[in-house]
Amino acid sequence: MLNGYTILDLSNRVGWLAGRLLADLGADVIRVEAPGVSIAGADWQAYHVNKRLLRLDIQTVDGKRNFDQLIPDVDILIDSAQPGDAFAQHLDWARLKQLNPRLIKVSVTPFGCEGPRAGWLASDIELMAAGGAMSLAGEPDGAPMRVTVPQSYGWAGAQAAVGALTAAVHRTATGIGQHVDV
């Protein structure tokens, strides 16, 4: 389904499933990791199956230059850069669409890229509580309860993949990329 699509995955745990789903649909997903970052964990292996690995230190001048050289050939970029973080400025949508007007950028962060909570960090349990999901677990009249498997990361990743696919349909019709903020 997505044969011929090239995707750069710079996301953290919140967005890992998005890249996995798009890879499962046939896209060429390139996982970008800094040199020295361990890829030995079972969770890393599970979410990055069907992806190629590119070791690139995007915090350095050379790494940023090499990253910029990739963008014109990329269809979708998935990131989890928090607004205000050092590399987030390099991932600025206005700057990236200058490099590739057809690019689809999918940002997967706990509270989005804009608004009063943009830039806030949150764990899965905090996101489940904030979203009301904990009130759905446990006894009918009991206290909210955490579901043991991280739910919010999966929901965010699935929604990011759907957002990327929707933006790809839009791009096919218009020729224009867009920023999807999950």
Please tell me what each predicted stretch does.
Residues 1-37:
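Conserved small-residue-rich beta-alpha loop and adjacent elements
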Residues 24-57:
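Glycine-rich phosphate-binding loop and adjoining beta1-alpha1-beta2 segment
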Residues 17-21, 41-45, 161:
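Hydrophobic alpha-helical segments in the ANL/AMP-binding
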Residues 11, 33, 81, 109, ...:
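Nucleotide-sugar donor-binding loop of glycosyltransferases
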Residues 11-14, 59, 109, 153:
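Structured beta->alpha junctions
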Residues 30-32, 54, 78, 104-106, ...:
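Hydrophobic/aromatic beta-strand patches that form the interior of the parallel beta-sheet core
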Residues 21-25, 73, 85-182:
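Active-site-adjacent "lid/gating" segments in soluble enzymes
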Residues 8, 47-98:
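A structured beta-alpha segment of the ubiquitous adenosine-cofactor-binding alpha/beta core
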